[in-house]
UniProtKB/Swiss-Prot annotation:
Organism taxonomic ancestry: Bacteria, Bacillati, Actinomycetota, Actinomycetes, Mycobacteriales
CDD domains xref list: Ribosomal_L16_L10e
Gene3D superfamilies: Ribosomal protein L10e/L16
Record function comment: Binds 23S rRNA and is also seen to make contacts with the A and possibly P site tRNAs.
A molecular-function term among this protein's GO annotations: tRNA binding
Assembly mode: Part of the 50S ribosomal subunit.
Gene: rplP
Record's protein name: Large ribosomal subunit protein uL16
Gene Ontology cellular-component terms listed: cytosolic large ribosomal subunit
Family: Belongs to the universal ribosomal protein uL16 family.
UniProt region (Disordered), positions on chain: 1-22
Length: 138
């Protein structure tokens, strides 16, 4: 799982989900990528599930890059707890994804297999996304 080793503050405010991504919108390392089309919080478990889906489909001969890191904690109070008595304990780690952000990149020789692997990964994510290639950008 992707979680920060050490953080300055255990609990953070939730960022507003607005605007579009200013950086990380291009495929830099691989040949194909998954680009977000809407706002969402993507958890560390969803990122890991998508990574496993890609790796199981391509088996060997390819390389996967994860371009996002879940660095924000989301808190939750226990069930059947009365209101008040402070903020809950950190439960998940999420990344605030904005439209245009490239989440995963993949380098693989066969385009059809690469697109199939990325499609499987998109189904694991809680956002609408599309597959982009390095040639699409320029």
């Amino acid at each position: 799982m992707l979680i920060p080793r050490k953080v300055k503050h255990r609990k953070q405010h939730h960022p507003r989900q607005r605007g579009i991504a200013s950086g990380g919108t291009a495929v830099n390392f691989g040949d194909y990528g998954i680009q977000a089309l809407e706002h969402a919080y993507v958890t560390n478990r969803q990122i890991e599930s998508a990574r496993i889906a890609i790796n199981r489909h391509i088996k060997r001969g390819g390389k996967v890059w994860i371009n996002v890191f879940p660095d924000r904690p989301l808190t939750k109070k226990p069930a059947e707890t009365r209101m008040g008595s402070g903020k809950g304990s950190p439960e998940w780690w999420v990344v605030n994804v904005k439209p245009g952000r490239v989440l995963f990149e993949l380098s693989y020789p066969n385009e059809q297999t690469a697109r199939a692997a990325l499609t499987r990964a998109i189904h694991k994510l809680p956002i609408k996304a599309r597959i982009v290639t390095r040639e699409d950008q320029f």
